[in-house]
Amino acid sequence: NDFYYNGKALNVRDKSSFEILKDNSGENTNWGKDKYNGYYLNGTVIPNIDYATFHPIDAHRLIQSGYYAADKYKVFFKGKEIPGADPATFREVDFSIGQDKYRVYQKGIPTQIKDYNKLTQFGSLMYSDGTHIYDLDFNILQGADVATFEHISDNWYKDASHVWWINKLVRGANPKTFSPVKVTSFAGGTSLDFNYGKDDKHVFYQDSIIPAADAASFEKIDFPDGDSWTVFDRNHVYQGKDSPKLREYLKKKYGK
């Protein structure tokens, strides 16, 4: 006999003392314990915990990962010990991001950031401490100019001299003329694309140039007779279906 979570055996050592631990609101968490071990409910056994003090770390915020727990001696992420983390001061400050008196942790991994609260977030993928720009793993974005760095939209960022797709440098992109490709939906109007961008000379998919693509006419539209989205310019179809509605659109716009 054993306890199971989502069909997976937890390998509980002492079934009489086993319990699923709750958060401060009384909801079940991903953690359990018996008098010998702690358990992360993916099946990870944490031996030799301090039974009296082993507890989930509640983030005291609506959206939290539930990935962290501690006893009075150690901190754990998904059942793995975080070496050097201070259990007395450790807390979850954002989804999967931990903080103690020493540093910030991303998914249980120590980072070079000392104080999460001193960071400014750019979009959802970048941070700044006023000296450097950091990606989601808190690695420095090499070459980024803090004074001119900005979030364009979604996955796109730039400074005075560079463009990035997430944390990848888009080589050859001109930040003065760069913009994400406009997306036109017959159902929902217009938006900007996560993955396609262009400047005055080139078109890019993520961080790579699309050879021979025509920047002036490059578009993304969901024609009603196409296969979902059609990505095209006046000369080529790069994604989707070369449909009658596309041909009609090109003829009306470019006479071809």
Model-identified regions with their sequence ranges:
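Non-catalytic tandem-repeat scaffold regions and their flanking low-complexity/translocation tails
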Residues: 1-256
